Amino acid sequence: MAVQAYRSLKKYETFSYLPQMTPEQVRRQIAHAIAQGWNPAVEHTEKGTPAKASYWYMWKLPLFGEQSVDAVVAEIEACHREFPDQMVRFVAYDNYAQSQGMAFVVYR
């Protein structure tokens, strides 16, 4: 697996150091989050702002109890269609730890 140059692009999350995920890899990550019992959500923000200083806007409400990967991917695609010039990320909330279990940018 190829790794991108360290300082070539802005880093928004852990997977930023790897090449862009394929749609199948995104689906597998979402399936893993659902299998953990985490609640999926979709967020978006403007491009060009530093990741730590930017505010991520929630797309609708979290998909509480959603078990379908297709439904989550459909929401990600709908958000991207609505905001084609913005970054879109997937977030999985862990009810037990009361924190994010996973988050990664799907569209940079």
Curated annotation (Swiss-Prot):
One of its GO terms (molecular function) is ribulose-bisphosphate carboxylase activity. It holds the Pfam family RuBisCO_small. It comes from the Bacteria. The keyword Oxidoreductase does not apply. GO terms for biological process: reductive pentose-phosphate cycle. Keywords: Calvin cycle, Carbon dioxide fixation. Heterohexadecamer of 8 large and 8 small subunits. Belongs to the RuBisCO small chain family. The basic functional RuBisCO is composed of a large chain homodimer in a 'head-to-tail' conformation. In form I RuBisCO this homodimer is arranged in a barrel-like tetramer with the small subunits forming a tetrameric 'cap' on each end of the 'barrel'. RuBisCO catalyzes two reactions: the carboxylation of D-ribulose 1,5-bisphosphate, the primary event in carbon dioxide fixation, as well as the oxidative fragmentation of the pentose substrate. Both reactions occur simultaneously and in competition at the same active site. Although the small subunit is not catalytic it is essential for maximal activity. This is Ribulose bisphosphate carboxylase small subunit. The gene is cbbS.
